[in-house]
Amino acid sequence: MLTSGFELLLPEGVLDYFEITNVEQTKGDTSIYLQEKNIIPEEYTDRRLESKGFYEDSKVQDFPLRGRVVYLIVRHRRWLDKDTGDIVIRHWELVAKGTRMTQEFATFLKGISRY
């Protein structure tokens, strides 16, 4: 996991599910790349799941920082159910219901649940 202070800019709770893999800065913006950790979703712990990569990145605009636009580039993980052959994902609505979260984290989950 990349740790260079950028984790302080993320909504509280994000690093429970994601790790920072890269940060890119240009003159006008900062992009923080987040990859979902290989933690089996709670609702699927009784199944035999195997990580099968990621969906296409989703891009969420976060609050500006010192005049720069901040983007969170999110890679969502997918798992294969070895018994059924189904692909499963983490259901962010369930994460939201099961956690005490800050308004920032709630906004983040709302942004990524569209993808």
Residue ranges of predicted features:
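Short helix-coil boundary/hinge micro-motifs
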Residues: 1-41
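Intrinsic disorder/low-structure terminal segments
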Residues: 5, 17, 53, 62, ...
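N-terminal juxtadomain amphipathic helix
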Residues: 31-80
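Short, positively charged, Gly/Tyr-enriched micro-motifs
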Residues: 59-115
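Generic detector of short, locally flexible boundary/turn motifs and exposed helical patches
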Residues: 1, 9, 43-48, 55, ...
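Residue-identity detector for threonine
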Residues: 3, 21, 26, 30, ...
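Intrinsically disordered, low-complexity segments enriched in small/polar residues
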Residues: 3, 11, 26, 51-55, ...
